Amino acid sequence: LAQSIRTIIEHDQARDKTTQTLANALKNRGKVQGDWGEQVLTNILHDSGLREGEEYFVQDNIKDEEGKNLRPDVIVKGADGTRIIIDSKVSLTAYSDYVGAEDDEQRKAAIKANHESIWKHVEELAKKNYAKLVDNAVPIVLMFVPNEGSYILAMNHDASLGSKAY
């Protein structure tokens, strides 16, 4: 019995370490967060019955006015030929700080940082002008936030965030 308990404890500790490693990877590496967000987005499109390469295109290369290569995460092809551009943006670090906050001061700071992170993504996305660079694109770009908690936290902090982004 003692050996079984030790084994259970060892497995539990190994699981905790793996979970912490994954959380740290997502929290501290922008590229990992971005890849995760893109994967969530493409999974949703696929699970909705859309076919990659036919109804949506991942990381299509487009050029801006200066010839610089840009790659929106997804371009969805509408039935009428219009294009809907979707770019995934992840704000996980500040949200994780909010969830782990131990007092109101830490929570308030994390709420503000989360809002600022999302707003920074909005501004960066707006500067890319994807909608002007893709033929038949609708005049707006959708920003997909795969972490619903982060999105809700930002909207609760500033309900006008969506209209400001538009």
Where are these regions (language model features)?
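Amphipathic, heptad-repeat alpha-helical coiled-coil/stalk segments that mediate oligomerization
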Residues: 1-166
